[in-house]
């Protein structure tokens, strides 16, 4: 009988999770805080979260508040870290340039229009990233065109007519408002079914 009691008392071994030294995440400029998800990720690696947030917010002071920045944090064994802040995410830059808030909802939907000149300027910004330093601008532009296609942004190889673009954006805003209303109605109907 004693062996059964000892088996019950014996606790399961606690398995310690070892996290990697590199943490890759997107953090909004000037908005780093100890709240989830960033705080727990840093705490698990033994970093002082408050000091990290203070340093990150100070270093991103020249960015507009809320801009998503890809960040690489390399944690050293003595609990210090190297912080690498990249340029804003490609999708954010493309959406800002096209003046849209969200990507396409269906396969063949066009949500915005950009010219090759816009893509060239964005490519010059992205070429400052460590990962794209030795990549030619032409190749970066091709990657941006593929991302535009994924988001539903139409790439024009000639200048955009301002009147035509304004009409497109007004029609697009009406369509997005209708889509959001439809989604809200579906969500409300689903909530009514579950109660």
UniProtKB/Swiss-Prot annotation:
- What does UniProt give as GO cellular component? mitochondrial large ribosomal subunit
Query: Superkingdom, according to UniProt?
Result: Eukaryota
Question: Which Pfam families does its entry note?
Answer: Ribosomal_L11, Ribosomal_L11_N
Key words of the record: Mitochondrion, Ribonucleoprotein, Ribosomal protein, Transit peptide
Instruction: Report the InterPro entries cross-referenced here.
Output: Ribosomal_uL11 (IPR000911), Ribosomal_uL11_C (IPR020783), Ribosomal_uL11_C_sf (IPR036769), Ribosomal_uL11_N (IPR020784), Ribosomal_uL11_N_sf (IPR036796)
What is the annotated localization of this protein? Mitochondrion
Per the record, the GO terms for biological process are: translation
Instruction: Identify a single GO molecular function assigned to this protein.
Output: structural constituent of ribosome
Subunit-structure text:
Component of the mitochondrial ribosome large subunit (39S) which comprises a 16S rRNA and about 50 distinct proteins.
Protein family: Belongs to the universal ribosomal protein uL11 family.
Q: Entry's HAMAP family?
A: Ribosomal_uL11
State the protein's name.
Answer: Large ribosomal subunit protein uL11m
What is the organism field in this record? Caenorhabditis elegans
């Amino acid at each position: 009988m004693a062996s059964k009691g000892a088996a019950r008392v014996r606790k399961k071994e606690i398995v310690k999770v070892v996290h990697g030294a590199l943490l890759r995440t997107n953090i909004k400029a000037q908005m780093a805080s100890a709240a989830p998800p960033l705080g727990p990720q840093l705490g698990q690696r033994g970093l002082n979260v408050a000091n990290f947030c203070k340093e990150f917010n100070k270093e991103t002071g020249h960015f507009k508040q809320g801009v998503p920045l890809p960040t690489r944090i390399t944690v050293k064994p003595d609990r210090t870290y190297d912080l690498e802040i990249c340029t804003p995410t490609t999708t954010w830059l493309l959406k800002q340039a096209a003046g849209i808030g969200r990507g396409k909802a269906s396969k063949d939907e066009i949500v915005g229009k950009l010219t090759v000149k816009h893509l060239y300027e964005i490519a010059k910004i992205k070429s400052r990233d460590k990962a794209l330093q030795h990549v030619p601008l032409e190749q970066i532009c091709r990657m941006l065109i593929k991302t535009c296609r994924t988001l539903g942004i139409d790439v024009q190889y000639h200048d955009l007519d301002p009147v035509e673009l304004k009409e497109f954006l007004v029609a697009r805003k009406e369509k997005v408002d209708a889509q959001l209303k439809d989604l809200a109605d579906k969500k409300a109907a689903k909530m009514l079914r579950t109660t």
